[in-house]
């Protein structure tokens, strides 16, 4: 089934409103979810939405309240998200980081006691749209075993970086595991196999079964280099921001548990180094040089840009099981679907 971005956004807002979420918070959450689907990160789009609905019903995600700034300097802040929707907390966290960067050149905001926030790239893009460099990191429930180990104690730990440019969308949003766990959940829902070489079962044997992988371990991307980056993000989005880490991280997949992961949001103002327009021209020049080396050379962000253009025109495809689940949620809340 195919729906328009507007239909998806409207449904999410209606459901969240019916569950007691304010219009402001519902719109923020819907924007992040639709952005994920438009960019092609369908494992973190509306396919993940039923998890949030379940968390709200169970009380692990709070529908109302405010974030609390626990500690603050001119360039740094630590936020307690008070278990609100993760999209809302991260959005407000990056807004604060951007404001700090306007004054000092850099804003760094750490978050704990929040929830799964969807795609990391949305928040980095917020900085980019303000002519700043945005960097977002988060940790997750354990899914990745250390190199040489068999027991998952690391999250998939994504990192996203967005850079302002006049002519291009320059951005990367990636898991530091060989695959995001959301991709495994999506493959399991669709009864699809996963590629070889990205996961092992609970006995350490290679598997293409997403369910065995979910009960086993995802491999780090890029061998020891990916493992090292995953390890470092666990610290930057865990101990640094007063959040849990390793086997103590809960609630990013299982909505029955209070979420204990952390986020680190960074905004850097290039204009504090030199003229912002000159910086963006230099970025454009570099991209042109990269693209001049071959006919089909892509830069980080090209695939997302092409996906957005395609899906804004053609719509967002939903699989049968997801449609059934969304209809079930809507029926429970007496919401009439328009599609």
UniProtKB/Swiss-Prot annotation:
Catalysed reactions listed for this entry: (S)-malate + NAD(+) = oxaloacetate + NADH + H(+); (S)-malate + NADP(+) = oxaloacetate + NADPH + H(+); (2S)-3-sulfolactate + NAD(+) = 3-sulfopyruvate + NADH + H(+)
SUPFAM superfamilies noted in UniProt: L-sulfolactate dehydrogenase-like (SSF89733)
GO molecular function: L-malate dehydrogenase (NAD+) activity; L-malate dehydrogenase (NADP+) activity; S-sulfolactate dehydrogenase activity
EC number: 1.1.1.310, 1.1.1.37, 1.1.1.82
InterPro entries recorded: LDH2/MDH2_Oxidoreductase, Mal/L-sulf/L-lact_DH-like_ah, Mal/L-sulf/L-lact_DH-like_NADP, Mal/L-sulfo/L-lacto_DH-like_sf, Malate/L-lactate_DH-like
Class of this enzyme: oxidoreductase
This protein's UniProt keywords: Cytoplasm, NAD, NADP, Oxidoreductase, Tricarboxylic acid cycle
GO cellular component: cytoplasm
Swiss-Prot/TrEMBL GO biological process terms: tricarboxylic acid cycle
Highest taxon in the source lineage: Archaea
Known function: Acts on oxaloacetate, sulfopyruvate but not on pyruvate. Has a higher selectivity for the coenzyme NADH than for NADPH.
Subunit relationships: Homodimer.
PANTHER family cross-referenced by the UniProt entry: MALATE DEHYDROGENASE, OXIDOREDUCTASE-RELATED
Family designation: Belongs to the LDH2/MDH2 oxidoreductase family.
Name of the protein this chain belongs to: Malate/(S)-sulfolactate dehydrogenase
